[in-house]
């Protein structure tokens, strides 16, 4: 046996090399498919399986073999188990067969081992239609003995299906013995020992139901036969039940429980016994999916008790046909469900409850058990409200007060309101005095226990009724009349108070209060003196009170002091008490002074021929101090009645001697003496030829008689009282000649005094001129030394803005040397024969004095007449920079009335001829027919051959001569329209002809859906006529784009560079909210325009409004810097003489002023990178005198120019429904910067406390927000998704005590409202934790995922204003920048949040802007970066330490680069 086993491999090798094809002649002796193996398996078309583990071996009777002698003799196929590992298999494949009738396959087999061990297993497999191998249909294992055994295969697979029988030998663990087969026969009749199955039919069933296969077999069902249902993939299902049909036929049932689509496959029946096996054909299990609608029902109509729907059952998921349609509906708040069968496309649901939400679904049914599919998507809708059932019951009065009434009513349930949304309104009306009525309706809270009507008038009949209203109707209660209680009365009307003054009494009357609020019972008047013209009157006494009856509305107050102001308080009273008092001040009249009694007293002390000396005694003031004493001389006439001494009618009109002489007056004033000159009796000489207070006291005429009067006068405000007395009489002399005083001598004396004074004044003026010249030379030297210190001057400017400059006089409109703006600002026409040429020409002195001066250092020579080239017209003088803030504030009062008046004074419309522009051949070249080029200033193009009209383009020269460094620049600007399609070639001709290097574009191509400018430049290269324009570089920034072109012309060996500066930050309507971006834009253009270049081409759409704004601002910035003044009004006026309607709106005119003011206040704050380190150290140096630094002053300037938000700016954040979404109500985002949420989340609003911010290069690149509150976490993730944010920067800590929860999943996946957030990874790098999230919107899954990285910064302690490390914070910024460049092609936004969305977040944004600024422009401008952020949100970079930290990080970045 061992020898034979050892020799078997050699035998196998010889067998494999045997020439089997030569034995093909023996095939004819076998039936198809059978084989006796006399000539080997190949002769029977049997094949070894190429993919098994080893081969069957052929044993031939004609060839020697080495099998043990006890093995059968003859030819057969054998497997030696001892040569193979357990589990290895050998397969022998019979040829494929197609039989059309019942047949049988029988064969011989043995399993033998010398020691009686298990040699392995013989399996029979049947493959159908070249499908997969299933489990064996028959097998035998273990030792069977030395003799051959027979077995049968009853295969019930019929044509056209084909099958293949496979014999498989499997080695067992014993590895000993042989497995052999022989004499395989295919018989044309049924098997004798194994039953044959009838054809197995397909089974169709609905998903979720049980499927049953019934296999019917012909033959005897032996007790030991094994039956099962075999699936094509090898799964075996046991038999459920067998049943004998008759003595030769039985049935077997197989059941599959609750089948699904995954159970749909091919199945066959198998029976097995020791004698053989039977196998049926494969039948298909077909699983049908019950139908379900794709779409929900569609609502066609709705009423209070019905819903009309369309089923929408044509598009389904699942299988048809549909044999039944049903509608299933229920209240969304209830649990019961009703189902109605429907046989029409539409269905009306009746008997529903009003204002109730229903969920409606459609059910579809196909044939078969379980054919009803799942309900389709729901239609959730609500019925309309129904009219209220009845009128509310009568109101019950719960409380009556003077100004409020409390009412209540029955509880209003749904059975009354018939609607969940209803209003309870109390309407009331009442009549006031003068037949005035008042009516109003108040919405009440139906759930409140009591309802109060406030703000009612006291002591008034009020009619009330309640109205119950819902969207479908209203019911009103009966009207109830109630009288409110009395209250204290209102004040006595101020206008009704009238006081009539006398010297010692006041008559006061008044009217009843407009709001008596009941029955007036009395009036009370309190009064006291508060001041007096007479110092002797006491004014600090206690107030006195007078009470009047209710019907007495006047009173006379006696025994008062003259010239004294009394304050009266009048108040009325009802039974409820006194109301508020009304005050009035009344002043008693003053009394005339009291003069001493001269009756019987001779006041004459001495008398000469031309004089008389009298004794003057002081008067006694009564109610007002003495203002003056007057001496009146009256000439005696013999026929005039003599005045009596003592009290008399005084002389009120002062008349000088000269006027009396020429006018024939009978008296004249000889002197007026101040009261201080007469503290006690003193002599006075009448006729002493002296002048007193302008009154000449001439010598008296000896031959005339005179009465001498002494007057005392008291005068306060507009009241004057005079008392006079005759104190002496001088009789006429009888002998001396008459001497008449000569007024001419008095005049000569005055002239002499004036001449001496003038000489002294001239000397002083000459001295002042010398001082001014010396001062001026010193000032010029100081200005030259201070050229590099712009920041210090800016700070001084802010600190000194509101001071009055006593040493610098303003420009006066009366100056006879004032000239027009065209004259004084050197606007020069282009053509010498221009009718608008000014005649004034500046001389060398103008040029010499026009040296560059600092922007904020206003030069003294502005006060020196014609020396300044910036004096202006008489009506609108230039404004000093130092006075600009005050001027603008004044002009903005009363709704900017000053600006409105100035702007409306400009000439509107055409002011010069434009015949060329109006020609028919030029009409298509004008964008607007009313804004075209004037003839006298138009740009004349060099004509194209054979086209005389080709010299026209809608453009005008704007001429200005700037004396800067001795260079004159006529035609500094060209103002033109935005090109239309027909003028693109002309536009480039103009740029080439005028040698322009800069194009300024102040419009977008399309605004509000209208084309504003044709795209006249290429993205790459384009040819326009004979011009080739190539775009070589484009630099997009947040508010403007800089494009660099090369310009070539056919026939010219020259390539020019032209830069286009396209300002994109001008809004579609109005003007920019702030001028910061435009000012930066203008500075960039100035720096880029070469000194030798031609005019700057400026255009918007029409070339008037925005173009004019740009040019005026540019001119005025130069003017302010050179001369310290601005003249906006006359500049606009001059520009309008060159092109129609430059600066088109009042809003633009105001914006120009605001822009100039911002430029003057802020100054130039950019520092070149190469100078930054030295400049920064200079900025932080503390000045020993001021104890401050330039950096601190700059931050104070920043605070002063930061706009303050008003309540109306944040109207959306202030809405009541948004209050709980704000962490701090004093840190709200303005409406104009809000990112409104797009994704809907139930009833949540679209508001979030966040603001869009510009970065250096990209508008709205940053979103700054507060740390999410517990109730805004969902909103935060909506914000991230809706605005494509790829970075989240977290600058504060998680702190539940401050309402700062963890808003992200640490691992795995969480859902926040409609947004699903999945944490993909988490890592830590120094002070930064990096988390990557994958988020998607579950309401819009088709949009895919958004990858977001969160940067949680750990290096900033909560109690510190700045981070602990500059380097780590800079690293954070650079990490975020790198991630942003990698994600979404750099287009993703960055969300930055701290506790309040202010200081910390602003600092991150500001440093990010500065880093980009350094990369792009090689400058550092922290002031501009923070100012730009604060224009949107004022709390960006809150503390001075944070502002300095921005500078520190900028320095760190420069030193590390």
Curated annotation (Swiss-Prot):
Nucleus listed as a keyword: no
Annotated Fibronectin type-III domain residues: 293-388, 391-487, 490-594, 595-688
Topological domains, Extracellular: 26-752
Active site per UniProt: 1100, 1394
Catalytic activity: O-phospho-L-tyrosyl-[protein] + H2O = L-tyrosyl-[protein] + phosphate
Residue ranges of the TM segments: 753-774
Signal peptide positions on this chain: 1-25
Membrane topology summary: Single-pass type I membrane protein
Disulfide bonds: 215-269
Record key words, sorted: Disulfide bond, Glycoprotein, Hydrolase, Immunoglobulin domain, Membrane, Phosphoprotein, Protein phosphatase, Receptor, Repeat, Signal, Transmembrane, Transmembrane helix
GO cellular component, one term: axon
First-listed, main subcellular location of the protein, grouped into a coarse class: membrane
Cytoplasmic side: 775-1457
Occurrences of domain Tyrosine-protein phosphatase (ranges): 899-1159, 1191-1453
Superkingdom of source: Eukaryota
Top-tier EC class: hydrolase
Cellular localization per UniProt: Membrane
Residues annotated as domain MAM: 30-193
Processing and modification events after translation: This protein undergoes proteolytic processing.
Protein name: Receptor-type tyrosine-protein phosphatase kappa
Organism: Mus musculus
Annotated gene: Ptprk
């Amino acid at each position: 046996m061992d020898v034979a086993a050892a020799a078997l491999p050699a035998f196998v090798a010889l067998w494999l090399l045997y020439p089997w094809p030569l034995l093909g002649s023996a095939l004819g002796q076998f039936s198809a498919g059978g084989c006796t193996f006399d000539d080997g398996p190949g002769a029977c078309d049997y094949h070894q399986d190429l993919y098994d583990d080893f081969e069957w071996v052929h044993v031939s009777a004609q060839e020697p073999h080495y099998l043990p002698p006890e093995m059968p003799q003859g030819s057969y196929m054998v497997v030696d188990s001892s040569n193979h590992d357990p589990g290895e298999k050998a397969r022998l494949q019979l040829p494929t067969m197609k039989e059309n009738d019942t047949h049988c396959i029988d064969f011989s087999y043995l399993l033998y081992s010398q020691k009686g061990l298990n040699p392995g297993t013989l399996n029979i497999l049947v493959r159908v239609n070249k499908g997969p191998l299933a489990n064996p249909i028959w097998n035998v294992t273990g030792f069977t003995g030395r003799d051959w055994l027979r077995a049968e295969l009853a295969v019930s697979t019929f044509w056209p299906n084909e099958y293949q029988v496979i014999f498989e030998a499997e080695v067992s663990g014993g590895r000993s013995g042989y497995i052999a087969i022989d004499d395989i026969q295919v018989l044309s009749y049924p098997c004798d020992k194994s039953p044959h199955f009838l054809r197995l039919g397909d089974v169709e069933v609905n998903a979720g139901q049980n499927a049953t296969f019934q296999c019917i077999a012909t033959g005897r069902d032996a007790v030991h036969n094994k039956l099962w249902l075999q699936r094509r993939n090898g799964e075996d299902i046991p038999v459920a039940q067998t049943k004998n049909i008759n003595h030769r036929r039985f049935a077997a049932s197989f059941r599959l429980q609750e089948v699904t689509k995954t159970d749909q496959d091919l199945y066959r029946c198998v029976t097995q016994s020791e004698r053989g096996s039977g196998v049926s054909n494969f039948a298909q299990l077909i699983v049908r999916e019950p139908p379900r609608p794709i779409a929900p029902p569609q609502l066609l109509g709705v009423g209070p008790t019905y819903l009309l729907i369309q089923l929408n059952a044509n598009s389904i998921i699942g299988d048809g046909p549909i044999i039944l349609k049903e509608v299933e509906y229920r209240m969304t708040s209830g649990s019961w469900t009703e189902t109605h069968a429907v046989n029409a496309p539409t269905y009306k649901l009746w008997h529903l409850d009003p204002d109730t939400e229903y969920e409606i679904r459609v059910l579809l049914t196909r044939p078969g058990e379980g054919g009803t599919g799942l309900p389709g998507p729901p239609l959730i809708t609500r019925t309309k409200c129904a009219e209220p059932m009845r009128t509310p019951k009568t109101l019950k009065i719960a409380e009556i007060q003077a100004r409020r009434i409390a009412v209540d009513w029955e509880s209003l349930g749904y059975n009354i309101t018939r609607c969940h949304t209803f209003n309870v309104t109390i309407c009331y009306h009442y009549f006031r005095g003068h037949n005035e009525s008042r009516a109003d309706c108040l919405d009440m809270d139906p759930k409140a226990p009591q309802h109060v009507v406030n703000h009612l008038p006291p002591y008034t009949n009020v009619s009330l009724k309640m109205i119950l209203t819902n969207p479908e109707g209203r019911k009103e209660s009966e009207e109830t009349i109630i009288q409110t209680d009395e209250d204290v009365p209102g004040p006595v009307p101020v206008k009704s108070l009238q006081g009539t003054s006398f010297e010692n009494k006041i008559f006061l009357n008044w009217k009843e209060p407009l709001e008596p609020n009941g029955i007036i019972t009395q009036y009370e008047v309190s009064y006291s003196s508060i001041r007096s013209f007479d110092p002797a009157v006491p004014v600090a006494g206690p107030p006195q009170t007078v009470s009047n009856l209710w019907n007495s509305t006047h009173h006379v107050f006696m025994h008062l002091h003259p010239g004294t102001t009394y304050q009266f308080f009048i108040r009325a009273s009802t039974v409820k008490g006194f109301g508020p008092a009304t005050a009035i001040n009344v002043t008693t009249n003053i009394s005339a002074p009291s003069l001493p009694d001269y009756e019987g007293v001779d006041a004459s002390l001495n008398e000469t021929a031309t004089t008389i000396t009298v004794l003057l005694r002081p008067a006694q003031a009564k109610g007002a101090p003495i203002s003056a004493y007057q001496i009146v001389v009256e000439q005696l006439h013999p026929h005039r009645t003599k005045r009596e001494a003592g009290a008399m009618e005084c002389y009120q009109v002062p008349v000088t001697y000269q006027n009396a002489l020429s006018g024939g007056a009978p008296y004249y004033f000889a002197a007026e003496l101040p009261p201080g000159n007469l503290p006690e009796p003193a002599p006075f000489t009448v006729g002493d030829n002296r002048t007193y207070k302008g009154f000449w006291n001439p010598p008296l005429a000896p031959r005339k008689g005179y009465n001498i009067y002494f007057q005392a006068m008291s005068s306060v405000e507009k009241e004057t009282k005079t008392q006079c007395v005759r104190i002496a009489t001088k009789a006429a002399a009888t002998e001396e000649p008459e001497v008449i005083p000569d007024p001419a001598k008095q005049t000569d004396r005055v002239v002499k005094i004036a001449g001496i004074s003038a000489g002294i004044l001239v000397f002083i003026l000459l001295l002042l001129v010398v001082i001014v010249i010396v001062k001026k030379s010193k000032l010029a030297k100081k200005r030259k030394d201070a050229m590099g210190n712009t920041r210090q001057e800016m700070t001084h400017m802010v600190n000194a803005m509101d001071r009055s400059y006593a040493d610098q006089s303003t420009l006066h409109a009366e100056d006879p040397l004032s000239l027009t703006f065209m004259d004084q600002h050197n606007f020069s026409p282009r053509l010498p024969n221009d009718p608008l040429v000014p005649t004034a020409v500046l001389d060398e002195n103008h040029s010499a004095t026009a040296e560059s001066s600092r922007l904020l250092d206003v030069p003294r020579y502005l006060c020196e007449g014609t020396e300044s080239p910036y004096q202006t017209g008489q009506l609108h003088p230039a404004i000093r920079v130092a006075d600009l803030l005050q001027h603008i504030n004044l002009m903005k009062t009363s709704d900017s009335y000053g600006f409105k008046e100035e702007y409306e004074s400009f000439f509107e419309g055409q002011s010069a001829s434009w015949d060329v522009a109006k020609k028919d051949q030029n009409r298509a070249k004008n964008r607007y027919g009313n804004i075209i080029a004037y003839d006298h200033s138009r740009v004349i193009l060099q004509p194209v051959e054979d086209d005389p009209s080709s010299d026209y383009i809608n453009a005008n020269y704007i001429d200005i001569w700037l004396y800067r460094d001795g260079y004159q620049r006529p035609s500094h600007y060209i103002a033109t329209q935005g090109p239309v399609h027909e003028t693109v070639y002309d536009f480039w001709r103009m740029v080439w002809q005028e040698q322009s290097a800069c194009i300024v574009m102040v419009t977008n191509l399309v605004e509000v859906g209208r084309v504003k400018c044709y795209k006249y430049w290429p993205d790459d290269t384009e040819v326009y006529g004979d011009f080739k324009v190539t775009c070589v570089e484009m630099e997009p920034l947040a508010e403007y784009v800089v494009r660099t072109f090369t310009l070539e012309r056919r026939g010219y060996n020259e390539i020019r560079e032209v830069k286009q500066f396209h300002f994109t930050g001008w809004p579609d309507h109005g003007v920019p909210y702030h001028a910061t971006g435009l000012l930066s834009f203008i500075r960039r253009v100035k720096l880029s325009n070469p000194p030798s270049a031609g005019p700057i081409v400026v255009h918007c759409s029409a070339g008037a409004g925005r173009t004019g704004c740009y040019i005026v601002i540019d001119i005025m910035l130069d003017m302010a810097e050179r001369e310290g003044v601005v003249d906006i009004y006359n500049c606009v006026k001059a520009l309008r003489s060159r092109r129609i309607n430059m600066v088109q709106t009042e809003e633009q005119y105001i914006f120009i002023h605001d822009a100039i003011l911002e430029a003057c206040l802020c100054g130039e704050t950019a520092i070149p990178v190469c100078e930054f380190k030295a400049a920064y150290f200079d900025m932080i140096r503390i000045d020993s005198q001021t104890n401050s630094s330039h950096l601190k002053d700059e931050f104070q300037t920043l605070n002063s120019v930061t706009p303050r938000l008003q309540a109306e700016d944040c109207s959306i954040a202030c809405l009541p429904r948004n209050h709980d979404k704000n962490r701090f109500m004093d840190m709200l985002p303005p409406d104009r910067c809000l990112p409104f949420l797009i994704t809907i989340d139930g009833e949540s609003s679209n508001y979030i406390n966040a603001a869009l911010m510009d970065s250096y290069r990209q508008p709205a690149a940053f979103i700054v927000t507060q740390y999410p509150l517990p109730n805004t976490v969902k909103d935060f993730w909506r914000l991230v998704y809706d605005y494509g944010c790829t970075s989240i920067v977290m600058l504060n800590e998680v702190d539940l005590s401050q309402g700062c929860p963890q808003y992200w999943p640490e691992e795995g996946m969480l859902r926040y409202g409609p947004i699903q957030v999945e944490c993909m990874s988490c890592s830590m790098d120094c002070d930064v934790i990096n988390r990557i999230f994958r988020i998607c919107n579950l309401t819009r899954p088709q949009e895919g995922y958004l990858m977001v990285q969160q940067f949680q910064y750990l290096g900033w302690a909560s109690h510190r204003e700045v981070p602990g490390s500059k380097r780590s914070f800079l690293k954070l910024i650079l990490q975020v920048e790198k991630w942003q460049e990698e994600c979404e092609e750099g287009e993703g936004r960055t969300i930055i949040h701290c506790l309040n969305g202010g200081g910390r977040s602003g600092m991150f944004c500001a440093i990010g802007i500065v880093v980009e600024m350094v990369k792009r422009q090689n400058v550092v401008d922290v002031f501009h970066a923070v100012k730009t952020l604060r224009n949107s949100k004022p709390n960006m970079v809150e503390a001075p330490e944070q502002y300095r930290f921005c500078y520190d990080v900028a320095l760190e970045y420069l030193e590390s680069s």
